[in-house]
């Protein structure tokens, strides 16, 4: 990509003297290793100041990296210092930008030690700002943005508070998989399905611990939610498949990598309806009046906000997988040693705020591990044409099993890890997250070999065991049955080249949270509605029970986010 971001200043910046010579005037380019590939910058200086910084080339993940690519150059130019904060959630990209700019300034003869010193400017006192709107939404992930758009569609004025420097939450980092029964399209692809089947698998897959009425709302409205997204130009692939832990092929895969398509569609819709989004603004407290939630206090970079809601507040700030203290409170063995796939903002802030106003919690002890970690990279996150083998080269589990059962089995294997084995039939140029397979191979994340003998040697497993595992799987494909009880079958693993990706479990989804009713109103400990208070998305509990099916999280965010926004807008 060329000239993605450019930042410049006019005249001398604060704290610099026009006569003080600091650099050799000119334009300088430099590179640094980014998250996905080298990142290239151009820095222009005059004798005394940094004038302009351009990001010339990068292959960073859209949405997740945008704030780092934009805000760090801007901050360096404005403050004339390299001592700027990295962007939470995009640390690798942030550091790459800083390193590249540092190298360019070295070329310009800059005193790097001096440039790394913090500005001596006194901290600016934050201004107290009071605002009023119809609906306040806390969190700009899939649920929050869905709520904001749905409320705005009803004519409500909406303000969204997002503590991170970018929208997206966990949605933008997801695999983009959306479960919805679409009988007509599924039947055309030879798939028999029904809403009843989706309900049964979701409810029983959650060990019958979910609230049946909420499960019913999810499965009955997921297709409508998908069509709603499509009305804002969201694109899905034609083929319906299944992802790990989905139990059935009803997964609609987003055409854009990861969750980028969802957030692009919702941002477009929010802009259309003039939704106000305040980034880098953390909600800190719910404002109460006679038992009703009437607003939110929040802290931004420059302002302290007190925002009043004429109608309601929707809490959609996500789960708590990135909060080690909170998750170990409910599941002690999920310590800091257990990595998470979640973004760093998933710290349960909204749950804490909700508790303080009397909200009831449900299912906090149900925390799901994802069996597909290592940043979700690899040729695929689908299971239709994959087998899992341990470090002895043996299959050990039904790959289309529930995620909790998969993780239980994986953690019993050597090092708590396994290899996902694929052949050439399902390896595209990029996977569901937009990663180029060639780049993943170059990084060593994915191992590639022309035959199984070479693949076994590449990953250090016994050749005879790997070949036997693949051979037995291929026979099972013909019979549509195997000893592990697998139910999803597609093609054999027989056409080279072959691929192996090392994976392990990581904390992925917190099923517990604020207790809600069918209208997404938050309930107190006596089961009564807390007036003016709604919630949607991973911050809520009671939908997925003790285990969430793969592909059910995104419809959860869209369906319940939309319901919350509509009902909040209808408040008198």
Describe the role of every protein-language-model region:
Residues 351-355, 360-461:
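An anion/pyrophosphate-binding glycine-rich loop and adjacent beta-alpha core
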Residues 18-122:
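Active-site- and interface-proximal helix/loop "cap" or "latch" segments in soluble metabolic
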Residues 285, 465-547:
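A glycine-rich dinucleotide-binding beta-alpha-beta segment and adjacent secondary-structure elements
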Residues 327-352, 501, 540-572:
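A conserved FAD-binding loop/helix module that cradles the flavin
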Residues 130-160, 569:
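N-terminal Rossmann-like FAD-binding beta1-loop-alpha1 element of flavoenzymes
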Residues 157, 166-276, 280-282, 395, ...:
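Conserved N-terminal/central alpha/beta ligand/cofactor-binding core
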Residues 254-311, 351, 357:
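Helical element adjacent to the flavin cofactor pocket in flavoenzyme catalytic cores
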